């Protein structure tokens, strides 16, 4: 797991999380896996490009090596507190996340932003109606039929 946390002056954070790609439901072939790994490495390189004028060379063959290399490259940069422009969107549940589509981070010194909005990017928190749950403790009173006593008369006067 690779987690990169971005923080603004107000202490608000946005997180980019990268997981190890494995074959499964959505990644069926070696080619698909390589494509996903390349896209993932491209996102990491976007962040590094904000701090380094020339992208450092690296021979990485595993996800763990990529994590270690990324940490080694970014740790000294945290202290610089360099200002970055970041594309933060909402997910379907209304939580903020760093977008993974296209260019999502760049140096604030760039006057012409290359960050673009795509049709799938949610920029407003989705409004989701609350589900009405039945409270198991709030049970309506049950009506019991009137029972007659042995004489056939009820306690009630009428």
Predicted regions and their residues:
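Short beta-rich binding modules
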Residues: 1-158
């Amino acid at each position: 797991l690779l987690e990169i946390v971005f923080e603004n002056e107000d202490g608000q954070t946005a997180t980019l999380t990268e997981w190890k790609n494995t074959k499964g439901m959505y990644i069926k072939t070696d080619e698909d896996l390589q494509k996903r790994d390349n896209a993932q490495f491209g996102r990491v390189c976007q962040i590094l490009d904000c701090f380094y004028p020339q992208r450092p060379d690296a021979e990485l063959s595993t996800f763990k090596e990529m994590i270690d290399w990324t940490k080694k490259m970014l740790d000294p940069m945290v202290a610089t507190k360099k200002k970055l422009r970041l594309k933060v969107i909402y997910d379907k549940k209304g939580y903020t996340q760093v977008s993974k589509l296209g260019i999502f981070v760049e140096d604030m010194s760039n006057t012409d932003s290359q960050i673009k909005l795509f049709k799938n990017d949610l920029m407003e928190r989705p409004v989701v109606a609350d589900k009405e749950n039945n409270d198991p403790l709030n049970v309506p009173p049950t009506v019991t039929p009137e029972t007659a006593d042995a004489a056939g008369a009820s306690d009630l006067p009428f």
